[in-house]
Amino acid sequence: MEKKKRRWGDRKDGVLLRDLDGMHFITPLIYPNRCDNEAYIRETIDLTNMNAYLKKKNESETEFPYTMFHIIVAGLVKTITLRPKMNRFIANKNFYQRNEVSMSFVVKKQFADEAAEALAVIHAKDESNVESIHEDLRHQILDCKDVHKVDSSTDNMDFFNHMPRFLGKFLVWILTRLDIHGWIPASIIETDPYYTTCVISNLGSIKLNCGYHHLTNWGTCSVFCIIGEKSKRPVYHEDGTIEMREMLDLGLTIDERLVDGYYYSKTIRLLKKLLENPELLETPANQEVEY
């Protein structure tokens, strides 16, 4: 994304939108809280082509095999790069365009009740594609799974947890004030998952069906994506035949104040096209596709 000279009113992580229409100017003034403006979208993805694509990619990639999760992350990156209004956020009743496309997710260090979790963030570029994102995910996931390492977000939370309770509450209150005005430290913006474009939760990896996750008034994240558990379902063809195919549900929670329903509809159509035709993700994120 092209960097612009920072002007008065801009934030470290976003550019103030100064040319909004009247409706979008008024909306955050009368509906100021992100969590009060959640909308929910569910989309079903046919995994036939993705499964074949993964099989082909993993013929040569054995050390860190490509997975469905990697394809979905790459699909979200390309979708939001091509649909930039999805990368807006509202803070202090103002609209901002985020400076970059970023994704965050939780990594379970081990599949055990008492195992710790780590928070991972990837920062995409206009030229990012499925291969470069796969490499970013490799570094992030392997680093997070190291039981001897603590990610910076978790380390910060532990720091507050070890303080006297009254002091921790006071400092967090200070941070919420800074958050409102965009004065939060850059180190937090870089590593806090709720300052990213989209938070992704792969519930299917722990055998849960697709659901929805709330947004938060802390941070700037306007999109949350839940990945469900894949399953076989009937597909009915026009000639009357029935075929069982592997399907996947995605549950998206979005800030409905950002754009209108038509923009969201076209965005979901693009995401579905990319995930059902994953070879398109080998092109740079900013390269247009027909959908």
PLM features: what roles do these ranges have?
Residues M1-Y291:
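C-terminal catalytic/motor cores of large multi-domain enzyme assemblies
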